[in-house]
Amino acid sequence: MNQTELQQHMEEVSLQFFQKEFRHQAVFNTRLRTTGGRYLLKSHNIEMNPKYLENFGLEYFFGIMKHELCHYHLHLEKKGYQHRDKDFRELLKKVDAPRFCAAIPREITMHEYTCKSCGKSFLRQRRFNVNRYRCGSCGGRLKQTGSKKVYTESP
């Protein structure tokens, strides 16, 4: 999906679920990390995170669009548009939009080190110089035995 398709989908979702036009810009923002989308109060534009489209699919992405459009339409109507407001929660239920997003799994490289004396192994996220450090249990020399990718749930 590109920017023009995003704009078109945003306008269609707005008309279908809210019966109101979306008159501002919808753009992808790849710098968003922990949120699915963002409604900008000053410009009334909506920024969407393309990673949610890649990881969770189009149906989930439309849910995020509906959530951001709830902020958009309530703000323009001068009603409560924040997450804690009653108007916002009621509109979310009416259009069946999620209140919060699921976290995108992150890929982390874990480095494995093993003691040459006692054989104890441990994982670290950061690499370190094995010549400068020793085993905490026995004081033996360390060697890097490998690295592996781990996926985490939290951002």
Curated annotation (Swiss-Prot):
Zn(2+) binds at H67, H71. GO terms for cellular component: cytoplasm. Its main location: cytoplasm. It comes from the Bacteria. Coiled coil: none annotated. Belongs to the SprT family. Binds 1 zinc ion. It is found in: Cytoplasm. Its cofactor is Zn(2+). Keywords: Cytoplasm, Metal-binding, Zinc. GO terms for biological process: response to stress. Pfam families: SprT-like (PF10263), Zn_ribbon_SprT (PF17283). Residues 7-145 form the SprT-like domain. The lineage of its organism: Bacteria, Bacillati, Bacillota, Bacilli, Bacillales. The active site is at E68. This is Protein SprT-like. HAMAP family: SprT_like. GO terms for molecular function: zinc ion binding. InterPro entries: SprT-like_domain, SprT_Zn_ribbon, Uncharacterised_SprT-like. The keyword Cytoplasm applies.
